[in-house]
Amino acid sequence: MSMRLPAALGATAATWLVTACLQAPLALAQTPPAAPAVAITDQDISDAYIYLLGRLLVTRQQQLDFKDGMQWNTLYHRKPGAVDWPNPNLDVAYSEAWVGIDEKSCTQVTVPKVVDRYYTVQFLNGWGETLANINEREYPEHPNGEFAVCLKDAKVSLPADTQRIDVPARTLRVLSRVELGKDWSEAERLQHQFKMRPSGSPQLPEVPKTLIFEGQKLPGVEAFDSATVALQEPDINPGMEQVQAKVRAIAAAIADPAERARVDKSIHTQAFADIAKASPIIGHGTARDGWARPATVGTYGDDYLTRTLVNYGGIWANTQKEVIYYRGGQDANGKTLDGTQSYSLTFPGKQLPASMANYYWSITATNAKTFLVLPNSLNRFSVNDQADLKYNQDGSLTLHFAPSKPQDVADGNWLPTAPGQIYRLVLRFYGPKGDVASGEYFPPVIKHL
């Protein structure tokens, strides 16, 4: 780039500028010494760790899925009722896939006609962000038939009757959900009619090889050893550059053994403490009467704290337009729920859970540390609108949570708990409406009996 002096300055001004440069002291002409590196604070470490952890939870699950035999662009239909992952939704038939797309190949999806039953096909990116749902709510003019999920701006020729959906990611996690309802066999029949196939021959991505840590045991400084690989997946949310820069700076700094030890200590003190502090309200959520409701789920914007907590406690959560979750962990006295004790939860007749869901509601009890369902001899892990519920004379509904069925309580109103286990309740509203959808509703207090 050339730089020209304005003509109005004339030769005198030009001569003055040149002379001034030539007469500058030698010290000014030399390159100044580099500024000292900015110290990485404990808060920097905590922010970077929480951000990175959200991605590592996804890559851990991806590696485990492929280790278990999953293949790219293949939809796997799971047997209903499986409970071997955190916070399972026991009211749907799941199908799962990992999808790879590129500029020349989309993923084609066949959706059967589903009547009077909840269903959706959810697509998430490598950070746990929901990019799309296929259902009659999102596509009322094309609720079933042929769909194609394509990389944005991909040049792909598709059949005329295909609904194209553009997404900003090459790697996608897919979950298809079909409500079980009263007729599980019909739900399974519909589940197996969902199909998936690539439109061409996509260049499949490599499964990222990042740290795999056990269960809910969080890693320490070793998380940053996977930073370079983890950050290769674009984060679609704006404003993440600063925290990503922190992640990269820490990943470089821990090459020094002393700094590595300091970062590890900081993670185990401040980062873990920050996570523990945020967990009761699920990040930036709201707590009331022993229940917590997250501020956002499924799509997170700049709220990476909530994203990480959701990925940790119930990965692949959908958007609040589809489902709203409440987590109950304390009784009316502020004490944690104990599987040895007995509790009750009464919904007033004018606020029955069925009145606040377009599709269905359910409540599940899970271990407070592992997030797995509580084992019991009945293999009963949830209560929902399909249970044989008995209502009180005033129209209210009382549910009971206890290791053995309380006297004079209908069997359908009782959810068994496990003695000695601290647990939480997860209340789901699918197709939320009314005060649940607006955020004004909170469940009643849980009473210790």
Predicted regions mapped to residue ranges:
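Selective for proline/serine-rich intrinsically disordered segments
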Residues: 4, 23, 30-34
